[in-house]
Amino acid sequence: MTVTVNGLDQLKKLAGSDLGSSDWIEVTQDRIDTFADATGDHQWIHVDPDLAAAGPFGAPIAHGYLTLSLFIPLFTELLDVQGVSTKVNYGLNKVRFPSPVKVGSRIRLVARLVEVEDVAGGAQIVVDGTIEIEGGTKPAAVLQSLSRFYA
């Protein structure tokens, strides 16, 4: 369920709130191949299903940075900040990839809005995010995201 706020004052009131979980999305071989083409990372563990099946993970796996890049579309399912002119990614802290995402797996984001602080012309949010793998015992990614919203 999406939490919608209008303006920075309403956003500030959400500090410390759990934002819940996104819907599950499937990580397909096509998505992995497209990411490989975009980044030039064609390592066999990602793009060669036959070799990867015999490799350490038993199947192709998503690039860690592909998993990380999915934070944004998953996060937009959780928080919609309206009444601002600009929304930008500011950075990341503490990114880890505890478990690989095998092709065909489904992932989702669980997020908490840790902090909202004033910055010149707007506000910066700090979000703790965990990208879970359906049926997995360890998350695919654990991160802290920084975003800015300008009035």
Feature annotation, model-predicted:
Residues 2-62:
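Catalytic strand-loop segment that frames the active site of acyl-thioester-processing enzymes
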